[in-house]
């Protein structure tokens, strides 16, 4: 891992001593965890393209371990020292340049020493590394924080001078974690985060009020429907036999009534003028002539001697029942027809009584 400077000095070509370069493939790379200082000209800004700005790792290693710094010194990728561009003169000059770089890095760390602790323990930037790294940005992409210049300004400018360096980075991290379901926070930080996002939790009462209005609207609709049912004057089909149909039509002359009768076909179907079909219906001893006009549909096949259901209105002047629908009656209709006739008679009595009083 280490080259001997004596062996490298023995190989001199063209009157210049070769510059000992460190093999970068075998070096132990340090993670880029710290933020660079843009105003300091001595700090390299090569790591800005990675989205997590930091100091070069060789300066950090020299600041922590200054005794092994001369053996691990490499060419700086951000800015090349002035001593590296000239021929090799002596090891003393190299050690002086390394020490000057180490002092410059320490002075760069002392730039923020007015507001924060400048001890070597400040290298524990794990919370800050999580918030600045690209993986963390993808994890907390739902946090409404601008990741551009505002994030760099937030991590570079000390908003809380009395707190350590890593506390400043934990504040936006905790606000982002408060939105996640699996986040765990303790103490006043959790309470402050919950207070910061309190308006988002106040939507549940709004939903409850909205949901609470639905039964009220349903009750209003039911009330309006109930009122409509009371004032409903729509057309109704009156179930009646032939005798009761003639009776109600004679007593209620000014109202158009639509009757429903169940009777037995007592004649063959004959064709008449204007696409009409005539036939006779019998109910006990009462016989009623009927007519059906095939205007929009044809008359279905009727069988003589069977019970049929006829719907239409009665013309007392011509003594004819003008049908609008004729079909064979089902067994259930024949069973319930007598009950329907009783209900219709009661309704018609009430209707005639009200109209006579008016």
UniProtKB/Swiss-Prot annotation:
Biased composition (Polar residues): 1-12, 30-51, 81-121, 150-159
Coiled-coil stretches: none
Predominant location: nucleus
InterPro entries listed in its UniProt record: Spata22
Tissue: Specifically expressed in gonadal germ cells, when male and female germ cells progress through prophase of meiosis I.
Subcellular localization, as worded in the UniProt entry: Chromosome
Gene Ontology CC annotation, any one: chromosome
GO biological process, one term: gamete generation
Quaternary structure annotation from Swiss-Prot or TrEMBL: Component of a multiprotein complex with MEIOB and RPA2. Interacts with MEIOB. Interacts with the complex BRME1:HSF2BP:BRCA2.
Name of this protein: Spermatogenesis-associated protein 22
Organism phylogeny: Eukaryota, Metazoa, Chordata, Craniata, Vertebrata
Gene: Spata22
């Amino acid at each position: 891992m280490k080259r001997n400077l004596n062996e490298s000095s023995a190989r001199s070509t063209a009157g210049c001593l070769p510059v000992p370069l460190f093999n970068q493939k075998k070096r132990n790379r340090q993670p880029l965890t710290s933020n660079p200082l843009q105003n300091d000209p001595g700090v390299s800004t090569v790591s800005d393209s990675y989205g997590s700005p930091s100091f070069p790792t060789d300066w950090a290693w020299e600041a922590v371990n200054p005794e092994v710094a001369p053996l691990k010194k490499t060419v700086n990728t951000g800015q090349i020292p002035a001593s590296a561009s000239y021929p090799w003169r002596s090891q003393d000059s190299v050690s002086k340049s390394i020490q000057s770089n180490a002092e410059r890095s320490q002075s760069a760390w002392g730039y923020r020493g007015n507001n924060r602790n400048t001890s070597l323990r400040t290298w524990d930037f794990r919370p800050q590394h999580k918030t600045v790294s690209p993986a963390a940005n993808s994890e907390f992409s739902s946090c409404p924080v601008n990741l551009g210049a505002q994030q760099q300004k937030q991590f570079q400018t000390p908003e809380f001078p009395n707190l350590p360096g890593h506390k400043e980075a934990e504040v936006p991290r905790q606000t982002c974690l408060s939105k996640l379901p699996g986040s765990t926070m303790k103490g006043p930080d959790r309470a402050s985060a919950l207070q910061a996002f309190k308006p988002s939790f106040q939507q549940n009462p709004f939903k409850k009020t909205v949901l609470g209005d639905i039964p009220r609207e349903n009750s209003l609709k039911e009330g309006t429907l109930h009122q409509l049912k009371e004032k409903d004057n729509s057309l109704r089909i009156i179930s009646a036999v032939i005798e009761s149909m003639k009776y109600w039509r004679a007593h209620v002359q000014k109202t158009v009534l639509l009757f429903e009768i169940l009777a037995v076909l007592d004649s063959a179907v004959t064709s008449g003028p204007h696409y009409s079909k005539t036939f006779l219906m019998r109910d006990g001893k009462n016989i009623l002539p009927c007519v059906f006009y095939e205007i929009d549909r044809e008359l279905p096949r009727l069988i003589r001697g069977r019970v049929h259901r006829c719907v239409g209105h009665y013309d007392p002047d011509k003594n004819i029942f003008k049908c609008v629908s004729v079909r064979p009656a089902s067994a259930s209709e024949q069973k319930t027809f007598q009950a329907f006739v009783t209900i219709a008679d009661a309704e018609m009595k009430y209707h005639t009584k009200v109209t006579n009083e008016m």
